[in-house]
């Protein structure tokens, strides 16, 4: 252990490692000037004490949505303060909070409401929030990151509707606006009409970064993050190229660069080279798979386990075979099974997440079927599944 600490102290790789972390927001965001300006235009009325429009920011993972929102609000809050106007951003991640109750609690606590961990309904938390806001002044801008997770929970759409209509219950001294951030371009289409009509007053779409744009971003951050001369010339272009293949994900590019540096540091090497980037890619993929599998709902985990068990036979499994094995597993656990249609939907979701791969094949006069196989590191999947006490009983 002591040698690990010594190696970290003696390392000459990093200067400011934290500028490569996902939650770091720099003062300059290359290739997002148009999005910064548009969101600033939407929120600028707050400087006059007026309610800004609600906004929805769309885009795939790593396209700069959250960073743009945070940078605009950071500057807006500072400018408002210099004018004697209170603008308070409230950041809540709907996926991390998991339930409408916890989302509502996080918003309420941000304005000084004490909320018990359990014991109240969402409606009661909302009423406490309204009561508290009614006594305040200023503009409160709620940023709901990964907002698409909220309507998937019971009561989530109702909470969204209430938030978008909350100003009708407040006086003219305080205003609330909502900025939603989502990776799902079809998010709004699945909402109830009453929610849809009031949620996305302004919509901003963030395109994926290109490889040259990712290279610009990495070069800017690398100047701050690393000591001079420690990066081989082809490290940044390689990180940019690998991330560009995955829909232009800047977060992925930054992770590759950071982990490559950490691997070089752990190996007590003085330079970061191509092989460190490839090692970083493998390490990140294992971590990504573990995180995705760990957070799957129970029935999705059982479907995934069914696919793995059937794959032991050496060939891809059909949807029908997966469903029969899944029903056996639910029976073993004493659970109600979901429908074949729902299992087919779960398989599509796992495919989209990159955990399995599926393809439709023709079986002649027997028609078409879908063949499914694992598309992620098997050991990483097994380890993540084993952390669930229910699933662990089946391994």
From Swiss-Prot:
Protein name: ORC1-type DNA replication protein 1
Metal-binding in keyword set: no
SMART domains: AAA, Cdc6_C
Domain remarks: Contains an N-terminal AAA+ ATPase domain and a C-terminal winged-helix (WH) domain. Domains are separated by a rigid linker.
NCBIfam families found in the cross-reference section: orc1/cdc6 family replication initiation protein
Keyword DNA-binding: yes
GO molecular function: ATP binding; ATP hydrolysis activity; DNA binding
Function: Involved in regulation of DNA replication. Binds DNA.
Family from the record: Belongs to the CDC6/cdc18 family.
One Pfam family cited in the UniProt record for this chain: Cdc6_C
Domain of life: Archaea
Any one GO biological process: DNA replication
Keyword set, alphabetical order: ATP-binding, DNA replication, DNA-binding, Nucleotide-binding
Residues binding ATP: 63-67, 209, 221
């Amino acid at each position: 252990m002591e040698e690990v600490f010594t190696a970290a102290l003696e390392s000459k790789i990093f200067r400011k490692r934290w500028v490569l972390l996902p939650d770091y927001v720099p003062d300059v965001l290359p290739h997002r000037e148009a999005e910064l300006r548009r969101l600033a235009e939407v929120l600028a009325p707050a400087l006059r004490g007026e309610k800004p429009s609600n906004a929805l920011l769309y885009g795939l993972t790593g396209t700069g949505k959250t960073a743009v929102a945070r940078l605009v609000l950071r500057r807006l809050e500072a400018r408002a303060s210099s004018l004697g106007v209170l603008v308070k951003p409230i950041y809540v991640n709907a996926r991390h909070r998991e339930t409408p109750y916890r989302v509502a609690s996080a918003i309420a606590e941000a304005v000084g409401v004490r909320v018990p961990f359990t014991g109240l309904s969402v409606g009661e938390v909302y009423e406490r929030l309204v009561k508290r806001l009614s006594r305040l002044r200023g503009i409160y801008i709620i940023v709901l990151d990964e907002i698409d997770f909220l309507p998937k929970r019971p009561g989530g759409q109702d909470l969204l509707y209430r938030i978008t209509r909350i100003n009708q219950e407040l006086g003219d001294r305080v205003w609330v606006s909502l900025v939603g951030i989502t990776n799902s371009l079809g998010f709004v289409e699945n909402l109830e009409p009453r929610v849809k009509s009031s949620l996305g007053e302004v919509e901003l779409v963030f395109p994926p970064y290109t490889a040259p744009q990712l290279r610009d971003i990495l070069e800017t951050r690398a100047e701050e993050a690393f000591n001079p001369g420690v990066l081989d010339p082809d490290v940044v272009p390689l990180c940019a190229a690998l991330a560009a293949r995955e829909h232009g994900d800047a977060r992925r590019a930054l992770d590759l660069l950071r982990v490559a540096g950490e691997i070089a540091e752990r190996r007590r090497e003085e330079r970061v080279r191509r092989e460190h980037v490839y090692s970083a890619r493998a390490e990140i993929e294992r971590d990504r798979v573990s995180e995705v599998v760990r957070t799957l709902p129970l029935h999705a985990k059982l479907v995934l386990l069914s696919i793995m068990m059937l794959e032991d036979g050496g060939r891809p499994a059909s949807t029908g075979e997966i469903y029969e094995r899944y029903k056996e597993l639910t029976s073993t656990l004493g659970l109600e099974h979901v429908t074949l249609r729902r299992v087919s939907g779960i398989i599509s979701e796992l495919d989209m997440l990159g955990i399995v791969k599926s393809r439709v094949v023709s079986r002649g006069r027997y028609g078409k079927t879908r063949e499914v196989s694992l598309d992620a590191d098997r050991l990483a999947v097994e380890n993540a599944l084993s952390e669930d006490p229910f699933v662990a009983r089946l391994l």
